[in-house]
């Protein structure tokens, strides 16, 4: 029942071309073992069972084709400001929005100011006071609608990036589904762990990311000093260098995790 609830939650995210394909049912032709859903957090289940689009074409926010063929595309909304780190922000915010846990939707801007959606819904907005950003109440409202949520995300995606995620999210020595690999910088890069499998005691991970210009969240692969990539799943063994889309991540140093997994 828990899995079904999470899957339904993911499936109703606003987008087009909804299909029954999910991250979890990507075909693996070699002997990687699927991990059980038992013991996974709600957040891990949400990502693992997130729906994929029927098409593997990658498009930008305006519908222009970026890539004719890919490993797969996550079935979620894309806006004009949704790049790189914003893909992780989108998934994390959607997770709590559909659970109506609005107080858990909160991100810190690059300047360090935390902006909760629960405050935004009550009419608070980011304002500059001297040389400092603050949250100030500018209107009397109680608006948790999808349209207001999207307006909130537009601001968050504009002022939150790889540098602030690298700074603000906790480190983790043990990567899990839903965790991030983060190169904080201007620009930096962020990739999301969307699935995990095992073979002979080694953990293999599948990743996704977005890019510039703002575009679909695409399933991606790469190489690892931890061993051979198997059917697009990348091994991580202790201190490992992973290369994806030309970016080099070091584990565990670049692993970031989210608080509130359930």
Please provide the spans of the model-predicted regions.
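Substrate-binding/catalytic groove segments of enzymes
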Residues: 97-101, 190, 199-203, 215-218
